[in-house]
Amino acid sequence: MIRFVFAGFLLLTVRPMVAQTSSYALIVSSASGNGEFKEKFWNWSSQMVQVLKDEMRIPRENIVLLTEDPSMNATLVNGKATKAELAKAFDGLAAKMPSDGQLLVFLIGHGSFDGVDYKFNLVGPDATAAELKSWLDRFEKRRVVLVSSTPCSGVLTKTLSRNGRIVITATKSEFESNDTIFGQFFVEAFKN
């Protein structure tokens, strides 16, 4: 597991000298449940867009941001964090990305595990681990790094791992259901 985390950070933290036209990102900020989480998730997601654009030199048109409330910044947000919009974002990226492209998927917010399935909490119906796997499998020949800063995300390492894909989670186990702060430190690591 440590080697996967190191490889993921190495892949993502090399500061490019030129625009990364074959690099793409999908950042999804989940349903918050209250104002405190809404502000925290917004800060992490909007800061990540800025870091990817300014520090990593990923063109803004290659970055998709879905949030609970797109009106927080209509010029920065691409859509609402719903299952339909998430599926649409994966479809669009799969069609747009070159075969040698790399994709960062950053899930911010709340997740849950009911003893059977992991769910990423969205506005409306949640996305299951099986749905995430189905969407990610469309990027079969491309390098993919999935970072989940959600509680209960440890189960995703079992469900989503495969050759060419790095899965980094905030928790080791699917039973760790407390609020996480991993997203904050993940974003800060790129800023320094």
Q: PLM features: residue spans?
A:
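Active-site histidine-anchored catalytic micro-motif
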Residues: 126, 136-147, 161
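Solvent-exposed loop/turn segments at secondary-structure junctions
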Residues: 31-35, 69-73, 109-114, 125-128, ...
